[in-house]
């Protein structure tokens, strides 16, 4: 693993790659989606379906001129922060992984609430790309509470897919809506999944739901005990006030570790 560094900002990415825009609700984490709010603000008369059709881009690998956006070649790139690239409306989400695998100067973050489809799609990645060109890629899923953490990890497609030891897996516990034990019970045995990174944060926005500070503290302690880098993005203070300013955090939660070191800067 690259040496850890403390990230200076609440946003852990510096650039985005959005070949699709628009999404569909799948779990409680989606209820106050910021991407949906942005779309309503700037496209008030456009439905999500219309936006999906308008911004859907071709999945072809053939090098030719088209309307297809290319991913940024450097920086820390959040791939699909205005959609879920592993939603069933995206025909070949793994095609974007192949494309970003050609960019060696950046760091590429993929995040989904449909982890089963991500695992299924990753089977289609050519072995040479999988083995030699994805060290700067991080594949993660959202877990808002214990129920959905377990649901996403225990789906058959996830359980049947074996990520290589060198794969960079991460979990986004944001918005955190309940306590989470990052261990899992399989056949009576507690299994600790191997993660490269964990992000945790309270929900933001005027309709934000409760996020107890002890829930965040628990995840931080679990990560410390397991030697997993952890990034505390934003919290609700005991007063009830939301903040993403790290100097307002309790001192023991002023942690914004990223596992890629200076790569992507």
Each language-model region and where it sits:
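A C-terminal junction/extension of Radical SAM enzymes
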Residues: 2-4, 227, 232-234, 238-239
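C-terminal accessory extensions appended to soluble enzyme cores
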Residues: 237-265
């Amino acid at each position: 693993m690259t040496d850890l560094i403390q990230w200076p900002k609440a946003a852990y990415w510096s650039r985005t790659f959005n070949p699709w825009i628009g999404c569909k609700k799948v779990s409680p984490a989606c209820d106050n989606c910021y991407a949906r709010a942005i779309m309503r603000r700037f496209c008030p008369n456009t439905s999500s379906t219309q936006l999906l059709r308008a911004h859907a881009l071709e999945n072809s690998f053939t090098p030719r001129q088209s309307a297809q956006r290319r991913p940024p070649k450097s920086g820390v790139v959040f791939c699909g922060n205005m959609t879920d690239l592993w939603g069933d409306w995206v025909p070949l989400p793994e095609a974007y992984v192949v494309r970003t695998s050609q960019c060696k100067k950046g760091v590429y973050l993929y995040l989904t609430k449909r982890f089963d489809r991500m695992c299924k799609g990753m089977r289609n990645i050519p072995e040479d790309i999988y083995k030699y060109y994805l060290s700067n890629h991080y594949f993660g899923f959202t877990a808002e509470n214990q129920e959905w953490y377990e649901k996403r990890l225990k789906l058959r497609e996830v359980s049947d897919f074996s990520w290589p030891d060198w794969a960079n897996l991460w979990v986004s516990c944001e918005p955190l809506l309940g306590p989470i034990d990052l261990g899992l019970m399989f056949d009576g045995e507690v299994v600790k999944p191997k993660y490269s990174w964990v992000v945790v944060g309270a929900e933001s926005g005027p309709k934000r739901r409760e996020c107890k500070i002890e829930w965040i503290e628990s995840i931080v302690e679990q990560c410390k005990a397991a030697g997993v880098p952890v990034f505390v993005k934003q919290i609700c203070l005991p007063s009830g006030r939301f903040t993403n300013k790290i100097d307002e955090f309790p001192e023991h939660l002023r942690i914004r570790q990223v596992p890629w070191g200076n790569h992507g800067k």
